[in-house]
From Swiss-Prot:
It is found in: Mitochondrion inner membrane. Binds 2 heme b groups non-covalently. Component of the ubiquinol-cytochrome c reductase complex (complex III or cytochrome b-c1 complex) that is part of the mitochondrial respiratory chain. The b-c1 complex mediates electron transfer from ubiquinol to cytochrome c. Contributes to the generation of a proton gradient across the mitochondrial membrane that is then used for ATP synthesis. It is a multi-pass membrane protein. Keywords: Electron transport, Heme, Iron, Membrane, Metal-binding, Mitochondrion, Mitochondrion inner membrane, Respiratory chain, Transmembrane, Transmembrane helix, Transport, Ubiquinone. The gene is MT-CYB. Heme 1 (or BL or b562) is low-potential and absorbs at about 562 nm, and heme 2 (or BH or b566) is high-potential and absorbs at about 566 nm. A ubiquinone binds at H201. GO terms for biological process: mitochondrial electron transport, ubiquinol to cytochrome c. It comes from Scotophilus heathii. CDD domains: cytochrome_b_C (cd00290), Cytochrome_b_N (cd00284). This is Cytochrome b. InterPro entries: Cyt_b/b6_C, Cyt_b/b6_C_sf, Cyt_b/b6_N, Cytb/b6-like_sf, Cytochrome_b, Cytochrome_b_C_euk/bac, Cytochrome_b_N_euk/bac, Di-haem_cyt_TM.
Length: 379
């Protein structure tokens, strides 16, 4: 008699995706982040669903409803901080997942990589709209500044901004539609994740060496499920430590003040996970140029498979490329720091140098160093 998980039409799909999936035996803990992202998404959808039961998307009551959740709802404070800090954990895992893809050449699976970049855009859009919902000072001014960037688009810019706002400023209509989209997008993300996995399972997983490992496969369960469980325990420990001890560590104190259109905060900045892109945006004095650079800072990921000039897929055996990769990481950390600083000397010039270096490393230096590595290996 055949095992039901191998014969049942629905269970067979789950079995082939998560249980009997042939997986390279050499993949390291850097491959844990895919499953961690799935768990983060589940946590966000569940906590978000319960928060939505108590939240009201009206400018007069949004701030009060969030206060009500924290004070009057059973474990409402925990739901709220799990959701807010869960977003931070989501982005930490996301950036590490992308970093692993860059380091080990996973971008050579072009379809999987491209869907991943679309997923990144969808998650960033969801997080931005979620940040607006508590209707604090930083929520309101963040929404005003970021949506206003679209006015840089020639000819249709102003009309486009007013269409998104649903009026002549960020107001009730904006908050209502942002809540609707913030609720809807995670389910679109789930669909995209399924497509992402579909393309991944067409080719199979990459491995640290970048060499095909068809001869050395092991079943996903129990070997990698046990390994992923360790990553999960570490992530849950960090998340609970954040939620229970320092829930506001990554937030902005200004967001505890109700939104006031007549009072601009001294320093408008997004959540920490957008600071690198915000720094690139601010580094260019021209508005349209800044918006284009902001978009390109993420879109450049789509070009990476075409900029790969090496004979070797992974950076494991390319020491010069490794140095450049860690330089890029340091550069991104510098941009994140600059994004949180006021617009004054010396932060302006540091931001401009780091922004130029970001694009220079990805578009020019990486392909050149790949060619140098290729030449040295021949030599």
């Amino acid at each position: 008699m055949t095992n039901i998980r191998k014969s049942h039409p629905l269970l067979k799909i789950i079995n082939n995706s998560f249980i009997d999936l042939p997986t390279p035996s050499s993949i390291s803990s850097w491959w844990n982040f895919g499953s961690l992202l799935g768990i983060c998404l589940t946590i966000q959808i569940l906590t978000g669903l319960f928060l939505a039961m108590h939240y009201t998307s009206d400018t007069m009551t949004a701030f009060s409803s969030v206060t009500h959740i924290c004070r009057d709802v059973n474990y409402g404070w925990m739901l709220r901080y799990l959701h807010a800090n869960g977003a931070s954990m989501f982005f930490i895992c996301l950036y590490l997942h992308i970093g692993r893809g860059l380091y080990y050449g996973s971008y050579m699976y072009k379809e999987t990589w491209n869907i991943g970049v679309i997923l990144l855009f969808a998650v960033m859009a969801t997080a931005f709209m979620g940040y607006v919902l508590p209707w604090g000072q930083m929520s309101f001014w963040g929404a005003t500044v970021i949506t206003n960037l679209l006015s840089a688009i020639p000819y249709i810019g102003t009309d486009l901004v007013q269409w998104i706002w649903g009026g002549f400023s960020v107001d009730k209509a904006t908050l209502t539609r942002f809540f609707a989209f913030h609720f809807l997008l995670p389910f679109i993300i789930v669909a995209l994740v399924m497509i992402h996995l579909l393309f991944l399972h067409e080719t199979g997983s990459n491995n640290p060496t970048g060499i095909p490992s068809n001869m050395d496969m092991i079943p996903f369960h129990p070997y990698h499920t046990i390994k992923d469980t360790l990553g999960l325990l570490i992530m849950i420990t960090v998340l609970l430590a954040l939620v229970l001890f320092t829930p506001d560590l990554l937030g902005d104190p200004d967001n505890y003040m109700p939104a006031n259109p007549f009072n601009t905060p001294p320093h408008i900045k997004p959540e920490w996970y957008f600071l690198f892109a915000y720094a690139i945006l601010r580094s260019i004095p021209n508005k349209l140029g800044g918006v284009l650079a902001l978009a390109m800072s993420i879109l450049v990921l789509l070009a990476i498979p075409f900029l790969h000039t090496s004979n070797q897929r992974s950076m494991m055996f390319r020491p010069i490329s490794q140095c450049l990769f860690w330089l890029l990481v340091a550069n991104l950390l510098t941009l994140t720091w600059i994004g949180g600083q006021p617009v004054e000397h010396p932060y302006i010039i540091i931001g401009q140098v780091a922004s130029v270096x970001y694009f220079l490393i990805i578009i020019v230096l990486m392909p050149l160093i790949c060619l140098v590595d290729k030449y040295l290996l021949k030599w």
